[in-house]
Design a protein with these regions (language model features):
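An N-terminal, well-structured beta->alpha segment
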Residues: 1-68, 72-73, 152-185
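Gly/Ser/Thr-enriched, mixed-charge loops and adjacent short helices
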Residues: 13, 113-239
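N-terminal small/polar loop signature for handling phosphorylated ligands or for N-terminal nucleophile
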Residues: 36, 48-112, 200-259
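Short glycine-centered, acidic/aromatic-flanked micro-motifs in structured strand/loop junctions
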Residues: 52-53, 187-189, 260, 341, ...
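Proline/glycine-rich low-complexity loops and linkers
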Residues: 71, 132-165, 260-333, 337-338
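Short beta-strand-to-turn element immediately C-terminal to the catalytic PLP-Schiff-base lysine
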Residues: 117-120, 257-261, 338-340
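Phosphate-binding and adjacent anionic-ligand microenvironments
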Residues: 245, 283-463
Length: 463
């Protein structure tokens, strides 16, 4: 089954039997449930919902179904067209809308699409609110508008420029320093909306650029997740010389990865670390990332006199914790930068502008900047279990086993994380498959993988 319903939205592959895939029937039901939730919440007096989408092949079809359904529910639709996830988030607050729907399957392959749901603040729904939407959808507890109360449809393509203007207006984005540095970059925008908005951003920053996979066709030239194994094309281009760096985004431009001038990966985990180091050097404070993210952020934060906090995995969990501890920056180790001075959402445009500002101020090569940070390696493994396995019971046993050791700090807000003095391992169950994901980090890849494999064996021995 490739239809996945969760508190953050609904996603699946296009085509196939109703109920098993992302199809018009389920899109109507889920959109209707969301509109019902927004109206009942009463959080906004607005009668407008923003809709934006990435460049996926199925995006036009899904957009038409979503917009028609919202109008049928009596909501006015503000369609901002091809837009990044952060652009759509900002459009909600800029337009004073009651909420927003982002049509994107993020880094998933071309046959996937999804609906991501926003509240009146342009932020993802909380777990409680997401559960309420699921409940409404399950019960089909919604009522459509009569003929005199149908919503209106409006298009507005100005939000890309408004997003860029908001980035340029950030105090820590030093436009003049970036222009004076005369950077030349290579960008892989993976045939989606990054190819629409990033040239405009780089033009405004005075950066010379070459784009790979620029056309927003949705026919991705390679696996769209911005990992080293998928980025051979741009890495080879960098190795030819003549560039200061490479920039890679995912299809909805909320994840960001850099490539050094020599064609080597900067490291997706270090996107947030490097941007945070710059922000903290100017505005000291606290930081947040999720439990599966590199310890390097903690090290950099403490270097600047701040405190680091970890949250459960998931953007809404990160932003909630950031608000709790008044973090000046946060995000996720997958290249997600969240800068509250802009908005509480992962934003590659903000990340690019802050990174280039830092590089311009330091006057060093990207590889030299990377070498200035603590070096850690993360290994990723998985434990395959049977459907009848009590995963929660296994995680409790792991917690009890290691909770007795004096040099181990145990965290159980999201699975079980074991923090040792010089390494850590995080065991987290999947919500959609009978597996436990195992993330481990140490100062060498061998040690990280060894720690992960050790915990995998501990789990196998418990069955």
């Amino acid at each position: 089954m490739t239809l996945i319903k969760s508190i953050s939205g609904i996603r699946g592959t296009i085509g196939g039997p109703a109920g098993d895939t992302l199809n018009p029937l389920d899109i109507v039901k889920f959109t209707s449930a969301y509109a019902t939730f927004i109206r009942r919440s009463g959080a906004s007096k607005s009668n407008t919902i923003v809709v934006g989408r990435d460049a996926r092949i199925s995006g036009e079809m899904v957009k038409n179904v979503v917009c028609g359904t919202l109008m049928g529910m009596g909501y006015d639709v503000l369609n901002i067209g091809l837009a990044t996830t952060p652009t759509t988030e900002l459009a909600v607050t800029m337009s004073g809308a009651a909420g927003g729907i982002i049509i994107t399957a993020s880094h998933n392959p071309r046959q996937w699409n999804a609906l991501k749901l926003l509240n009146e603040k342009g932020e993802f729904l909380t777990a409680a609110n997401g559960s309420e939407v699921l409940s409404i959808a399950e019960k089909e507890d919604f009522e459509y508008a009569d003929v005199d109360a149908l919503g209106k449809y409006t298009e507005d393509d100005t939000f890309n420029k408004r997003h860029i203007d908001s980035v340029l207006a950030l105090k820590l984005v030093d436009v003049e320093a970036i222009k004076n540095a005369h950077f030349k970059v290579c960008v892989d925008s993976i045939n989606s909306v990054g190819g629409v908005i990033l040239p405009e951003l780089l033009d405004a920053l005075g950066v010379e650029y070459t784009f790979l996979n620029a056309e927003p066709t949705g026919d991705f030239a390679h696996n769209p997740e911005p990992l080293e194994k998928n980025l051979g094309g741009i890495m080879d281009e960098l190795k030819k010389g003549g560039y200061d760096m490479g920039i890679v985004v995912d299809p909805d431009v909320d994840r960001l990865a850099f490539i050094c001038e020599d064609g080597k990966m900067f490291g997706e985990e270090y996107t947030l670390v490097s941007v945070a180091d710059y922000v903290l050097s100017k505005t000291p404070g606290n930081t947040v990332s999720n439990l599966s993210s590199t310890r390097a952020l903690r090290d950099v934060t403490e270097k600047h006199g701040g405190s680091y906090c970890a949250s459960a995995v998931g953007e809404v969990n990160v932003t909630t914790k950031m608000k709790d501890v008044h973090a000046v920056i946060g995000g996720e180790g997958n290249g997600g930068v969240i800068y509250p001075e802009s908005h509480y959402g992962r934003d590659a445009l903000v990340g690019i502008a802050l990174f280039l500002s830092s590089l311009a101020h330091k006057g060093c090569k990207v590889s030299e900047l990377r070498a200035s940070f603590p070096n850690y390696f993360i290994a990723k493994n998985r434990i395959d279990l049977t459907a009848s396995t009590d995963v929660d019971a296994i995680l409790v046993k792991v917690k009890e086993l290691y909770g007795k050791e004096k040099d181990v700090t145990v965290t159980d807000i999201d699975g079980v994380k074991l923090d040792f003095p010089d390494k850590w391992v995080h065991l987290r169950k999947s919500n959609t498959e009978p597996i436990i994901r195992v993330y481990s980090e140490a100062t060498t890849m061998e040690q990280a993988d060894e720690l992960g494999k050790k915990l995998m064996q501990v789990v196998y021995d418990m069955q």
